[in-house]
Amino acid sequence: MLDSNLLRNEPDAVAEKLARRGFKLDVDKLRALEERRKVLQVNTENLQAERNSRSKSIGQAKARGEDIEPLRLEVNKLGEELDAAKAELDTLLAEIRDIALTIPNLPADEVPVGKDENDNVEVSRWGTPREFDFEIRDHVTLGEMHSGLDFAAAVKLTGSRFVVMKGQIARMHRALSQFMLDLHTEQHGYSENYVPYLVNHDTLYGTGQLPKFAGDLFHTRPLEEEADSSNYALIPTAEVPLTNLVRDEIIDEDQLPIKMTAHTPCFRSEAGSYGRDTRGLIRMHQFDKVEMVQIVRPEDSMAALEEMTGHAEKVLQLLGLPYRKIILCTGDMGFGACKTYDLEVWVPAQNTYREISSCSNVWDFQARRMQARCRSKSDKKTRLVHTLNGSGLAVGRTLVAVMENYQQADGRIEVPEVLRPYMNGLEYIG
């Protein structure tokens, strides 16, 4: 959520920045609502002051032995008018807040202006895509050869965009997540967390999934005996519960940065993705991811973004997977991001790079929703923290990249050296 003072005092400047990312801010409507808010605010305050004054007069009149009934009736009438004014003001403030919740974050000045993914800018590349002297098999074919990927069974159990993994393929999937967690906790300074896979609506508002992206989530219905409680939703990413751990907290600045990681399944409806990536593991309703989250001082967030992106890159480098680093243009960034790097791994069967990590600086956008603040020891003042999140990495897509990049002519899959300790020294699958 953007700073309400910024929206109130600099709507034209805000609108210009939002236009860079393709969002049209209705400045005239905001101004009209703000003018109405001022009128209602003054009216409410005047009524409050008048009622307080008249209430005080009742006591004074009573002390003088005067008839207080006319004053009492007047105070009651003022109270009714005040209640009505407060209700009208609350309704208007709710309307303003509802609008504010739909406004995306402002892009950082250095983010390239563009409309969509075609305007993203490549920053760097690492590694050279392997040249094969045999016909490349995709991960689906390789998985079926080794009885490791069973999409038909998943369709029977659930439906499309799910998978059943078996045997050594399932083991490699587990090995990848363990390797990522160990790297981030032992070398990159993150603390490991186990978090709920179901979260409440306050949590989803905190990180910006609600209200705008309700259709992208899998929602649950309450049990009959809990019908009065709020519904839950399955997490689309561990960013949601991890970041919300600091909701409504005031953190001493000497405790920052807070660096957290978690391995969780992620659940997404993939609304709007009909017909895209229908084969294989690239786009699933359920997939695993190792997430990184940092909570930092405002002045440290841009440096933290570079660091976090480097942590994701290190996973790919140790696995020996060629990738490129992209800075997303204004039109392709996520709703809450002010700056985002994507890492795209080389997928041989598609002869292209595919996204495997997205690392974003969210600035104070989530912190304002969550009321997550930090406090300096020197002056005891509080200010909003900055939050960052990044994939470190998407486990299923990493499995795809390993299977395809490490395939052999006979269909075997070489196990990357860094994964062998997690697979009992196994060198090849098959």
Swiss-Prot record:
Its EC number is 6.1.1.11. L-serine binds at T237, A238, E239, E291, S391. Pathway: Aminoacyl-tRNA biosynthesis; selenocysteinyl-tRNA(Sec) biosynthesis; L-seryl-tRNA(Sec) from L-serine and tRNA(Sec): step 1/1. It is found in: Cytoplasm. It catalyses: tRNA(Ser) + L-serine + ATP = L-seryl-tRNA(Ser) + AMP + diphosphate + H(+); tRNA(Sec) + L-serine + ATP = L-seryl-tRNA(Sec) + AMP + diphosphate + H(+). Its main location: cytoplasm. Keywords: Aminoacyl-tRNA synthetase, ATP-binding, Cytoplasm, Ligase, Nucleotide-binding, Protein biosynthesis. GO terms for molecular function: ATP binding; serine-tRNA ligase activity. Pfam families: Seryl_tRNA_N, tRNA-synt_2b. One of its GO terms (biological process) is selenocysteine biosynthetic process. It is an enzyme of class 6 (ligase). ATP binds at R268, S269, E270, E355, I356, S357, S358. SUPFAM superfamilies: Class II aaRS and biotin synthetases (SSF55681), tRNA-binding arm (SSF46589). Belongs to the class-II aminoacyl-tRNA synthetase family. Type-1 seryl-tRNA synthetase subfamily. Homodimer. The tRNA molecule binds across the dimer. Consists of two distinct domains, a catalytic core and a N-terminal extension that is involved in tRNA binding. Catalyzes the attachment of serine to tRNA(Ser). Is also able to aminoacylate tRNA(Sec) with serine, to form the misacylated tRNA L-seryl-tRNA(Sec), which will be further converted into selenocysteinyl-tRNA(Sec). This is Serine--tRNA ligase. It comes from Salmonella paratyphi C (strain RKS4594). The gene is serS.
